[in-house]
Amino acid sequence: MDEQVTLPPVADLTEAGPLKDRFLQAISSGTSLTVDASAVQRVSSPCLQVLVAGKQSFAKAGGASLTITDPSEAFRETASVLGLLDALELGK
């Protein structure tokens, strides 16, 4: 089972809490998630931290995965500045 989550144009602190809750729900039900980051124009470090923690939590739980697809240039640039490209499995 795979579901998609679409990040809004402004993925900031207000998005971090609900995103974390969605990840926890998916992990507990064994549901894989795909996070579409194509619309992101601005992303905050708290939101990126939740994504990194989510990647780690899904990996530890096994059975389900978290994939980030189509990161916008703004998303990729912020992740790069913060040194999170590898943690988010986005390469360079």
Regions found by a protein language model. Give the residues of each.
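STAS-like cytosolic regulatory interaction modules
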Residues: 1-46, 52-92
